[in-house]
């Protein structure tokens, strides 16, 4: 299956009433969207998601494999062997995902595989009514505080009725304190670093 044929399945599926729940951008988003529609017609979205997650974990644990996938000079024959090996080592490999890997190999884009997996997760979360959110803090949020933030966000207009919040805590010491909340394309920056930056800007403008 060529890249054009695989991606065209997205348009064909849309005409049949099957389309991704949200719009994604970039190459990873395009491939993830095409996979979503292909899986919904041929295998299952859940099956494709599990196979991608398994592949992503395998790559993350194997630095050598990651380097091979990222090598743009890898010969076409070797790329095919890599795809076949990954398919054999992945329990319950999904046919639609294997087709995707073949397309990525043909176009020398196997380095996009983990990115596609991440974008596909966004689609499945949206399909299942999950809203992804990230709260960035200088130190890890303790259980009780994390649940308080989670509850406050879940009840906010950011999430919406009938949706379920999927919250992740990202630690970045450089924000110095406070927190940064990101939900979809919306960001609320309450970090100390941001406040200092704004103060410095005001001081510069007043001099």
UniProtKB/Swiss-Prot annotation:
InterPro entries hit by this protein: ATP_synth_OSCP/delta_N_sf (IPR026015), ATPase_OSCP/dsu (IPR000711)
Subcellular location: Mitochondrion; Mitochondrion inner membrane
Record GO biological process: proton motive force-driven mitochondrial ATP synthesis
Keyword Mitochondrion on entry: yes
Record keywords, A-Z: ATP synthesis, Hydrogen ion transport, Ion transport, Membrane, Mitochondrion, Mitochondrion inner membrane, Transit peptide, Transport
PANTHER family membership: ATP SYNTHASE DELTA CHAIN
Protein's UniProt name: ATP synthase subunit 5, mitochondrial
UniProt organism field: Eremothecium gossypii (strain ATCC 10895 / CBS 109.51 / FGSC 9923 / NRRL Y-1056)
């Amino acid at each position: 299956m060529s890249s054009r044929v695989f991606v065209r399945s997205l348009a064909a599926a849309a005409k049949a009433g099957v389309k991704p729940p949200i719009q994604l951008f970039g190459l990873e988003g395009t491939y993830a969207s095409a996979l979503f529609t292909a899986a919904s017609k041929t295998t299952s979205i859940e099956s494709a998601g599990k196979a991608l997650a398994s592949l992503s974990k395998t790559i993350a644990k194997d630095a050598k494999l990651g380097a091979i996938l990222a090598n743009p000079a890898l010969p076409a024959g070797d790329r095919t062997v890599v795809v076949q090996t990954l398919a054999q080592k992945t329990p319950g490999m999904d046919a639609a995902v294997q087709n995707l890997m073949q397309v990525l190999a043909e176009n020398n884009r196997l380095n996009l595989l983990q990115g596609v997996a991440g974008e596909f997760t966004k689609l499945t979360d949206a399909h299942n009514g999950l809203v992804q959110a990230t709260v960035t803090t200088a130190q890890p949020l303790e259980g009780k505080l994390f649940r308080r933030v989670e509850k406050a966000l879940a009840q906010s207009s950011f999430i919406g009725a009938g949706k379920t919040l999927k919250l992740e805590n990202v630690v970045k010491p450089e924000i110095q304190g406070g927190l940064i909340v990101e939900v979809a394309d919306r960001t609320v920056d309450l970090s100390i670093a941001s406040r200092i930056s704004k103060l410095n800007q005001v001081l510069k403008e007043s001099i």
